[in-house]
């Protein structure tokens, strides 16, 4: 059981009614709270919850419809996403309690201050390096408009200006990160066919690929619902069309790909995790056609070349800058 869930269950009498659990971990909490409904924006956690508690978990950038007696937000990493989620939940709970739970090292005490705009916040419990906060929603806000929270910016790229739409919680929100900037300079001479942007974020790499290779079929994949929505908006802003899907890791990707392009993710919530990128390398060959190519950017200190050569083929370093390297390998 996740320690945040354990803290909630210490106060289980507060959550006996119709409770919405937002951003909950994929543990047994839903099984302990019979009246609870889950809202997740992480495709992997949603899939696990749906297998165990079918019909009780909603996925997306907006909460499920219905009336709730209370809601609990499991603190996400992004402060801007936290603000959007708290406002979204508080708008549905006038005169009712809203709870916030999170790890101390994840910034729960700072985030709890955001509850003050809805009423008087108080700390209910502290255990397992986590805290549980409550606020009675006396000043319910209007439901926030996700469009108004999006950041729009233009990148001047070799193929021309690219309009980017970035939503709260998406990696490198509102800016181009150094790794992707380097990879954008090394997208030439990709094989024709079906291309995958793995861990698509705001869709910058995917949109660039579609402009450069308009005859290729493009798939963008991310585990996060806000990233999926951002990519769709970025494509639309540039008059481009592609398939954008939510899925947990490379196993959710189609087969017979001509190329996989990625600035692979390295966070799971507030924690650093290289599981998704390592699994991508280990299983890329299963998703590539013969002579298909993988091209990724990664921190230079990560020992990916031996892993790439073990599972895919000869690893070439195409470029190095700002602490990042571009690796290329072709399936034999």
Swiss-Prot record:
Q: What is its EC number?
A: 2.1.1.172
Q: Which reaction does it catalyse?
A: guanosine(1207) in 16S rRNA + S-adenosyl-L-methionine = N(2)-methylguanosine(1207) in 16S rRNA + S-adenosyl-L-homocysteine + H(+)
Location of the protein in the cell: Cytoplasm
Q: Which Gene3D superfamilies match?
A: Vaccinia Virus protein VP39
> Can you name a GO cellular component term?
cytoplasm
Q: What does this protein do?
A: Specifically methylates the guanine in position 1207 of 16S rRNA in the 30S particle.
Family the UniProt entry places it in: Belongs to the methyltransferase superfamily. RsmC family.
The record, for PANTHER family, names:
RIBOSOMAL RNA SMALL SUBUNIT METHYLTRANSFERASE C (PTHR47816:SF4)
Name of the protein this chain belongs to? Ribosomal RNA small subunit methyltransferase C
Protein's gene: rsmC
């Amino acid at each position: 059981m996740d320690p945040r869930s354990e803290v909630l269950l210490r106060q289980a009498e507060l959550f006996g009614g119709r409770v919405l659990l937002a951003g909950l971990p994929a543990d047994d909490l839903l099984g302990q709270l019979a009246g609870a409904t889950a809202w997740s924006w992480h495709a992997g956690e949603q899939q696990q919850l749906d297998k165990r508690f079918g019909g009780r978990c909603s996925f997306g950038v907006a909460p499920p419809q219905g009336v709730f007696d209370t809601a609990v937000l499991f603190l996400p990493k992004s402060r801007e996403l936290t603000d959007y989620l708290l406002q979204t939940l508080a708008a549905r709970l006038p005169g009712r309690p809203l709870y916030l739970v999170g790890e101390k090292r994840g910034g729960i005490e700072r985030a709890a201050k955001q509850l003050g705009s809805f009423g008087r916040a108080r700390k209910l419990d502290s255990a397992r390096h986590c805290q549980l906060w409550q606020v009675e929603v006396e000043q319910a806000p209007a439901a926030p408009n996700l469009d108004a929270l999006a950041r729009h910016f233009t990148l001047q790229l070799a193929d021309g200006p690219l309009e980017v739409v970035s939503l709260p919680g998406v990696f490198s929100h509102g800016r181009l990160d150094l790794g992707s900037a380097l990879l954008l300079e090394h997208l030439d001479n990709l094989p024709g066919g079906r291309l995958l942007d793995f861990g698509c974020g705001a869709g910058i790499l995917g949109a660039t690929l579609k402009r450069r290779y308009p005859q290729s079929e493009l798939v963008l994949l991310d585990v996060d619902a806000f990233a999926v929505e951002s990519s769709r908006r970025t494509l639309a802003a540039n008059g481009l069309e592609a398939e954008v899907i939510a899925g947990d890791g490379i196993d959710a990707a189609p087969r017979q790909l001509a190329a996989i392009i990625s600035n692979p993710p390295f966070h799971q919530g507030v924690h650093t995790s290289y599981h998704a990128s390592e699994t991508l390398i280990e299983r890329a060959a299963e998703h590539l056609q013969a002579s298909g190519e993988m091209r990724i950017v990664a921190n230079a200190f990560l020992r990916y070349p031996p892993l790439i050569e073990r599972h895919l083929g000869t690893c070439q370093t195409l470029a190095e800058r700002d602490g990042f390297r571009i690796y290329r390998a072709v399936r034999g």
